[in-house]
Design a protein with these regions (language model features):
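Short beta-strand->loop micro-motif that forms the acidic, two-metal-ion catalytic signature
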Residues: 39-43
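Catalytic core of pol beta-like nucleotidyltransferases
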Residues: 1-22, 30-35, 45-152
Length: 152
């Protein structure tokens, strides 16, 4: 996976330049170890509107999918820092990061912000249901935090 990560970083640095803040891999390819696609969350400094967001997401998908000859399919999600911070709450799509994520590039210490969200999530009662099953995100967040504490 390291080769994949470094290629992703290089391509996104080239495409986004200094706007690139963080890259986070998440989704079933991370928490199950396999999946149809690789979900990638890209944080940039700012987005001027929905049109730019959609345009950038499409450019990223095309760039990555072509670069990997469609052998690996990428699903890109782009947020600016404000949107990222707004989504660090229980019930947002970022709650799913508790199932598994990997920060592969970071200029803004997003790991700390995600850990804070996991702490809040671990104290709540939140269940997520998706096509892979029913997930007690509160319990999973609690376990992830214990593992992180052990590893540091």
């Amino acid at each position: 996976m390291k080769g994949l990560e470094s290629r992703i970083i290089r391509m996104l640095e080239t495409l986004l330049g200094t706007r690139l803040v963080s890259i986070i891999l998440f989704g079933s390819s991370i928490y199950i170890g396999r999946g149809r696609d690789v979900d990638i969350l890209i944080l940039i400094d700012s987005i001027s509107g929905l049109d730019e967001k959609m345009d950038l997401e499409e450019k990223v998908k095309m760039l990555l999918n072509r670069s990997f000859n469609y052998e690996v399919v990428f699903d890109a999600h782009i947020l600016d820092l404000e949107q990222f911070n707004e989504n660090l709450k229980i019930g947002s799509f970022l709650s799913g990061l508790s199932l598994g994520y990997q920060v592969i590039y970071d200029k803004n210490n997003v790991e700390e912000k995600i850990v804070e969200m996991l702490k809040t999530l671990s104290k709540s009662r939140y269940i997520m249901v998706n096509k892979y099953g029913r997930w007690n995100l509160s319990k999973i967040a609690e376990i992830k935090l214990r593992i992180k504490e052990k590893n540091h």
